[in-house]
């Protein structure tokens, strides 16, 4: 509610007496909705018709646990604990013989569960500027030490019980990927400035890898901070975070456009859940129905789904917003419409696509 703001709904001020954004600071996108002022860098893409907003995104019986909800988004398994990441399946479908060790790349530390699948190599880049150091690992003992490091990085994503076999299957490929990725900075020339934050760095690295034409089809990153969990001090903290993310994404888009590499990129960004309708005096607690964004030169911008009702009798238990778009519907559009894959097989069912492509 403080990201895409229902500024003309009287319940917004009722529910957010401490945290409501002043109306004269809101950036209108319709006569009912507006962006938080810190999202100003993204407004141009809305005006271009290249930014889609999916309102009320979530899933039935939404979990209020960060870890469980992230797992559900990662594995498309709301009813049971899944081990296979949906993007891990995408990487395998795109490259079933495993011929390209860089079909999928994570920008950040460790291996997010979304990318985890047995036998599927994924390189994780903490800092592309120093990633080439791995190319110097030559001796067998040093390579073994590196594989042990990969094991400790990847265990949280796939479980310690299967990590040894996973590393045996994927660790060597990941090291090969490191050798190749280390060449990307030398192919990149750009004057676009990025924020000097972790997110800015990850997206700059992402632009370099995309520019290098390694055949990478899945580029993934996660905001490297947990302070989007704004139970307190939300007014300042949320604004700073939105500014960082919006500016980083704007820099990335400007970069790949000036590089002539934007026609085959679609960005999908989301949070694993929304926030409670009512503020707690300083912040907001875990909620359900949230918002997701899709950005790219091939995106049909606009609003998709309905903004969750703020009527008191339409809120879920605890004062949470109802979801009205299943996140797997957005995945369906990305998989069928963008990647040309069988979404049903990957996400485990048929879901009505969201027509943003």
PLM region spans:
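Active-site lining segments that contact anionic ligands and/or coordinate catalytic metals
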Residues: 216, 262-264, 270, 287-290, ...
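Feature for exported/extracytoplasmic and membrane-associated proteins, marking the mature portion
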Residues: 1-259, 278, 300-357
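Generic beta-strand/beta-sheet core signal
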Residues: 221-224, 268-270, 295
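Histidine-centered active-site microenvironments of extracellular/periplasmic hydrolases
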Residues: 271-303
């Amino acid at each position: 509610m403080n990201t895409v703001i229902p500024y003309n709904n009287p319940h917004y001020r009722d529910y957010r007496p401490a945290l409501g954004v002043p109306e004269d600071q809101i950036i209108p996108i319709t006569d009912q909705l507006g962006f938080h002022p810190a999202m100003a860098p993204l407004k141009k893409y809305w005006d271009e018709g290249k930014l889609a907003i999916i309102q009320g995104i979530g899933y039935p019986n939404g979990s209020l646990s960060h870890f469980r909800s992230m797992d559900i988004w990662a594995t498309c398994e709301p009813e049971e604990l899944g081990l296979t990441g949906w993007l891990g399946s995408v990487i395998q479908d795109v490259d079933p013989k495993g011929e390209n060790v860089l079909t999928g790349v994570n920008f950040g530390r460790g291996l997010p569960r979304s990318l985890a699948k047995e036998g599927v190599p994924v390189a994780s880049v903490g800092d592309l500027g120093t990633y080439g150091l791995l190319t110097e690992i030559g001796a067998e003992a040093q390579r073994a030490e590196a594989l042990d490091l990969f094991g400790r990085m990847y265990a949280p994503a796939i479980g310690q019980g299967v990590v040894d076999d996973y590393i045996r299957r994927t660790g060597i490929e990941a090291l090969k990927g490191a050798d190749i990725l280390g060449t990307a900075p030398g192919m990149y020339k750009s004057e676009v400035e990025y924020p000097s934050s972790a997110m800015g760095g990850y997206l700059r690295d992402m632009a370099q890898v995309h520019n290098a034409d390694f055949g990478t089809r899945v580029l993934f990153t996660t905001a490297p901070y947990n302070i989007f969990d704004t139970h307190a001090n939300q007014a300042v903290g949320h604004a700073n975070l939105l500014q960082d993310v919006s500016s980083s994404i704007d820099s990335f888009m400007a970069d790949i456009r000036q590089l002539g590499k934007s026609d085959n990129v679609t960005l999908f960004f989301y949070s694993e859940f929304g926030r409670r309708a009512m503020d707690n005096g300083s912040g907001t607690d875990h909620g359900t129905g949230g918002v997701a964004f899709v950005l790219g030169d091939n995106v049909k911008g606009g609003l998709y789904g309905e903004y969750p009702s703020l009527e008191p009798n339409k809120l879920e238990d605890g004062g949470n917003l109802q979801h009205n778009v299943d996140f797997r519907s957005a995945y369906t559009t990305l998989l069928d419409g963008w990647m040309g894959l069988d979404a049903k097989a990957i996400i485990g069912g048929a879901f009505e696509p969201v027509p943003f492509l």
